[in-house]
Amino acid sequence: MKRYIRIVAMSLLYGLVFVGCGAKGNDAKDVKVDAKTELDQVNKEDKKSLTVFAAASMTESLTEIKDEFEKENPGVNLVFNFDSSGTLKSQIAEGAACDVFISAASKQMDELDPTSGKKDSDLEIDPDSRFNLLENEVTLAVKEDSSKDIKSFEDLNTNLVETIALGNADVPVGQYSESLLKNMGIWDAIKGKITFGSNVKEVTSWISEGAVDCGIIYSTDAKAAGLKIVAKADPTLLDKKVIYPAAVLKDSKNREDADKFISFLNSDKAREIFEKYGFKQAE
């Protein structure tokens, strides 16, 4: 049936282009564009969709990886859902269709992993498919043209800083930030300066717009937004490494392509793209 539809669509395309030859100017162009759009839609419907839920901090890198993966797998259409890892995990637990999950922290993946002892959902990942994909860094960032002479995390507890943007407690970047500031002993002192964002992209946006003096985000987001990194967190002051685990959902309706995508994420081509955006390969 799909083949029949494609043949009809192609016939329609050639017919419309032929008719368009008799038209003039913009009318002919419009006919060709409309026909091409219809054919593109038919071709898209012929592809199998693979739904990937991924941490918001991976937006730029995975969008580029999508193009490379689809070149090698022309029968697959990658569909992304980017948000905070906590939000994505909740959506999966509530039954949202998802084939692959990539979190910005182990916590959210553990809550879907039947072998972790922390699982809190009926839906779950396939633990055999789980692996640590990437590592990131927690940084203090300001606008490139900021007039504030902020140079360190310690400056957050001075008059240099009036407003700070952090991710909220449900967001991995917020959890990393809170553990860092508590371990530094300045969390309680600066709480009144903090504005909380729903995910790392919102925090990054506030810094870029100058809505806050500074913010704590991943190095990859600072780089993508053209922000100035003034300090990087001491790893010993974080409760855990900033690790991005990936896994296939047990209920995936497209397991074969999900496995292909997981494999592609480990390829040299994907690693090159991740490194371009500032990610490190997880050890």
Question: Where is each model-derived feature located?
Answer:
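Signal peptide-proximal N-terminal region
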Residues: 67-79
